Design a protein with these regions (language model features):
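Bacterial N-terminal signal peptides that target proteins for export
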Residues: 1-7
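Intrinsically disordered, low-complexity repeat segments enriched in small/polar residues
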Residues: 6, 13, 24-25
Length: 261
């Protein structure tokens, strides 16, 4: 039974899929080929921009010029886990999430604003990895939908990067880290008990030209009264005695927000 449930806690792949940006290392030939393959199918994905700024009027101007699904947030807290969040990002800043089937870019006048006035996180969804058809069906059946904006809805954006060592592992070695074994509970088995009350979505930042130290963006939502559950989820995932995959993380910080619109 445990084998059946392994890999179910995967949003759009694995929570930790990505190659560190600006590492100064060359990708392997295998990864280059994967990148070429992905490029041909990106148009089928959902693109996202998380745009953060202390200037609410600027954010309003940005949303007026964008098409697609838009949500608005207010940053409540920032928690550095490994490494640090971008300089200037602070409590009280506004954030907009813009999703579209087409690739998203801000108009040039917004991209050239003074450094620190605006911070952009970019990503795109992919199909599920490391999951069988049966596992996907189970995940779809048990996972909850996004929450409505309200004072009771907390959203957390966690940019994450993995070490070069992870990407030097063979594919089967990486996948083994998601499996339940006699020694480890594993990433997906840990998360399975939370999927009914914590919404999650994964955006990849690899291969899309985003010059950033993170490899992908993990996005969560939950009701405020489930805050302790969410923290328990993170604590379990970060416990390398239960989830050895986390030992390959080299960048991780949490942006806690209120979903207001």
């Amino acid at each position: 039974m445990r084998t059946r449930y392994c890999c179910l806690f995967i949003i759009c792949a694995v929570m930790l899929l990505g190659e560190p940006k600006n590492s100064g290392q060359m990708r392997s030939n295998e990864d280059d080929e994967k990148g070429k393959s992905m490029t041909t199918t990106l148009s089928e994905r959902t693109w996202v921009l998380f745009v953060a700024s202390a200037d609410e009027r600027l954010l309003q101007q940005i949303t007026q010029q964008q098409h697609g699904r838009i949500n608005k947030y207010s940053i409540c807290d920032i928690n550095n886990v490994i490494g640090k969040a971008p300089a200037g990002l602070a409590q009280g800043w506004g954030v907009v999430r813009i999703e579209s089937d087409a690739r998203l870019e801000l108009p040039e006048e917004f991209q050239s604003t003074p450094k620190g006035r605006i911070i952009i996180f970019r990503g795109v969804t992919q199909n599920l990895h490391y999951t069988s058809d049966i596992q996907r069906q189970e995940l779809n059946k048990r996972s909850r939908a996004e929450f409505e904006p309200s004072n009771e809805t907390t959203a957390v954006l966690i940019p994450i990067g993995k070490s070069l060592t992870w990407w030097q592992l063979a594919q089967d070695q990486r996948e083994a880290h998601f499996q339940t074994s006699c020694k480890y509970k594993g990433h997906t088995t840990i998360g399975l008990s939370y999927v009914d009350r914590v919404f999650r979505k994964l955006y990849h930042s690899r291969y899309i030209g985003a010059s950033a130290p993170y490899d992908f963006l993990t996005y969560f939502e939950f009701n405020n009264h489930k805050r302790d559950d969410f923290k328990m989820l993170l604590n379990e995932l970060r416990d390398t005695s239960r989830n050895p995959e986390w030992s390959y993380i080299e960048l991780e910080y949490e942006i806690w927000m209120k979903k207001i619109e």
